Amino acid sequence: MVNVVLGSQWGDEGKGKLVDLLVGKYDIVARCAGGNNAGHTIVVNGVKYDFHMLPSGLVNPNCQNLLGNGVVIHVPSFFKELETLEAKGLKNARSRLFVSSRAHLVFDFHQVTDKLRELELSGRSKDGKNIGTTGKGIGPTYSTKASRSGLRVHHLVNDQPGAWEEFVARYKRLLETRRQRYGDFEYDFEAKPAEYKKLREQLKPFVVDSVVFMHNAIEAKKKILVEGANALMLDIDFGTYPYVTSSNTGIGGVLTGLGIPPRTIDEIYGVVKAYTTRVGEGPFPTEQLNENGEKLQTIGAEFGVTTGRKRRCGWLDLVVLKYSTLINGYTSLNITKLDVLDTFKEIPVGISYSIQGKKLDLFPEDLNILGKVEVEYKVLPGWDQDITKITKYEDLPENAKKYLKYIEDFVGVPVEWVGTGPARESMLHKEIK
């Protein structure tokens, strides 16, 4: 059994909380894409654990965790995050954590060039806007992967004669191509290979052939949960390109990032914030640059875990959600942070786009069009009631249930979970047929 948790908007929907809720039922939690460029916090027994690269399944002492071949790994950050979690009391994490031998490596010079590239792009653009990268080197690493010049985990841990010398030579060539492209930036070449020679010994016990790992688990009928990173609207192919991340963050990335066939997937859970947020630049049709946006940001505490940046806020965009559903094929939804809407008298939701009076059939791929669309809203009544103490779906205010029902009917997917507060237990389950 393989079930998948995916973000349906622009990230920060609360995927980690759903994974945290579900993880006790699973034998394995796997990540399939991205790196340490996103983050979420899980609270267990009053202890806060911040996850950026590592799978959230580490909070379950009986769960194995895998970083798949589609993940890109900055090895120093891998160990720093692991040590931070261990310092907070996470037990036997090292024996339950595995890394794909096919995963690509992020180096410090990738991070340097990530920031240089961002400055370059903002200087070229007419409005001075940039992509909004986290500066973690994710994009440049995927670039070297696509150009077939990158280094993978197996290159680092290979014990064969001459393998280390080959690693250093390839590392040097990779660095030189960056310098040719961006000029002679400050970087201690001599120190870095020496650092990685130490890290390779530390990393070896974690490394597995992830294809064998996953298929053995599937054959053994293990319960597997895939933890998606980022969200569909940040997908390199289907998101608001170029204001996207550098990997496939939808269901396609699950298959290629873990090496599993489509027939192994059972349930696909789409996580949807009850309103919409976005970090960084790029079109955002339902954004509210007014008191409503500020209110959503304040009540929702909308600041990024990884970057600390303020998130832009707006109303729920059902055009985005329907498009996301078409691609990812959600079998049920988790609506998060519904409580943030508690004090709004009226709650608009975006239901269609038009441009120059002509309604669009679907979410447009052209950002010149997307940036000019007019949004048609359906205004739904608020419930003006604190829902954070409610423990059963049936006890939600009628208008809150109507809000959820409207979402279900619009996208044709049932809501299975509803987030009603920041606490770990503030998640209502609704039976679905």
From Swiss-Prot:
<comment type="similarity">
    <text>Belongs to the adenylosuccinate synthetase family.</text>
</comment>
<feature type="binding site" description="in other chain">
    <location>
        <position position="309"/>
    </location>
    <ligand>
        <name>IMP</name>
    </ligand>
</feature>
<comment type="function">
    <text>Plays an important role in the de novo pathway and in the salvage pathway of purine nucleotide biosynthesis. Catalyzes the first committed step in the biosynthesis of AMP from IMP.</text>
</comment>
<feature type="binding site" description="in other chain">
    <location>
        <position position="245"/>
    </location>
    <ligand>
        <name>IMP</name>
    </ligand>
</feature>
<comment type="subunit">
    <text>Homodimer.</text>
</comment>
<feature type="binding site">
    <location>
        <position position="12"/>
    </location>
    <ligand>
        <name>Mg(2+)</name>
    </ligand>
</feature>
<feature type="binding site">
    <location>
        <begin position="39"/>
        <end position="41"/>
    </location>
    <ligand>
        <name>GTP</name>
    </ligand>
</feature>
<feature type="binding site">
    <location>
        <position position="148"/>
    </location>
    <ligand>
        <name>IMP</name>
    </ligand>
</feature>
<dbReference type="GO" id="GO:0004019">
    <property type="term" value="F:adenylosuccinate synthase activity"/>
</dbReference>
<dbReference type="GO" id="GO:0005737">
    <property type="term" value="C:cytoplasm"/>
</dbReference>
<dbReference type="GO" id="GO:0005525">
    <property type="term" value="F:GTP binding"/>
</dbReference>
<feature type="binding site">
    <location>
        <position position="39"/>
    </location>
    <ligand>
        <name>Mg(2+)</name>
    </ligand>
</feature>
<dbReference type="InterPro" id="IPR042109">
    <property type="entry name" value="Adenylosuccinate_synth_dom1"/>
</dbReference>
<protein>
    <recommendedName>
        <fullName>Adenylosuccinate synthetase</fullName>
        <ecNumber>6.3.4.4</ecNumber>
    </recommendedName>
</protein>
<dbReference type="InterPro" id="IPR042111">
    <property type="entry name" value="Adenylosuccinate_synth_dom3"/>
</dbReference>
<dbReference type="InterPro" id="IPR018220">
    <property type="entry name" value="Adenylosuccin_syn_GTP-bd"/>
</dbReference>
<keyword id="KW-0436">Ligase</keyword>
<feature type="binding site" description="in other chain">
    <location>
        <position position="134"/>
    </location>
    <ligand>
        <name>IMP</name>
    </ligand>
</feature>
<keyword id="KW-0342">GTP-binding</keyword>
<dbReference type="InterPro" id="IPR042110">
    <property type="entry name" value="Adenylosuccinate_synth_dom2"/>
</dbReference>
<feature type="binding site" description="in other chain">
    <location>
        <position position="230"/>
    </location>
    <ligand>
        <name>IMP</name>
    </ligand>
</feature>
<feature type="binding site">
    <location>
        <position position="311"/>
    </location>
    <ligand>
        <name>GTP</name>
    </ligand>
</feature>
<comment type="pathway">
    <text>Purine metabolism; AMP biosynthesis via de novo pathway; AMP from IMP: step 1/2.</text>
</comment>
<feature type="active site" description="Proton donor">
    <location>
        <position position="40"/>
    </location>
</feature>
<feature type="binding site">
    <location>
        <begin position="11"/>
        <end position="17"/>
    </location>
    <ligand>
        <name>GTP</name>
    </ligand>
</feature>
<dbReference type="Pfam" id="PF00709">
    <property type="entry name" value="Adenylsucc_synt"/>
</dbReference>
<feature type="active site" description="Proton acceptor">
    <location>
        <position position="12"/>
    </location>
</feature>
<dbReference type="GO" id="GO:0044208">
    <property type="term" value="P:'de novo' AMP biosynthetic process"/>
</dbReference>
<feature type="binding site">
    <location>
        <begin position="337"/>
        <end position="339"/>
    </location>
    <ligand>
        <name>GTP</name>
    </ligand>
</feature>
<dbReference type="GO" id="GO:0000287">
    <property type="term" value="F:magnesium ion binding"/>
</dbReference>
<feature type="binding site">
    <location>
        <begin position="419"/>
        <end position="421"/>
    </location>
    <ligand>
        <name>GTP</name>
    </ligand>
</feature>
<feature type="binding site" description="in other chain">
    <location>
        <begin position="37"/>
        <end position="40"/>
    </location>
    <ligand>
        <name>IMP</name>
    </ligand>
</feature>
<dbReference type="GO" id="GO:0046040">
    <property type="term" value="P:IMP metabolic process"/>
</dbReference>
<keyword id="KW-0547">Nucleotide-binding</keyword>
<dbReference type="InterPro" id="IPR027417">
    <property type="entry name" value="P-loop_NTPase"/>
</dbReference>
<feature type="binding site">
    <location>
        <begin position="305"/>
        <end position="311"/>
    </location>
    <ligand>
        <name>substrate</name>
    </ligand>
</feature>
<dbReference type="InterPro" id="IPR001114">
    <property type="entry name" value="Adenylosuccinate_synthetase"/>
</dbReference>
<keyword id="KW-0479">Metal-binding</keyword>
<keyword id="KW-0658">Purine biosynthesis</keyword>
<dbReference type="InterPro" id="IPR033128">
    <property type="entry name" value="Adenylosuccin_syn_Lys_AS"/>
</dbReference>
<keyword id="KW-0460">Magnesium</keyword>
<keyword id="KW-0963">Cytoplasm</keyword>
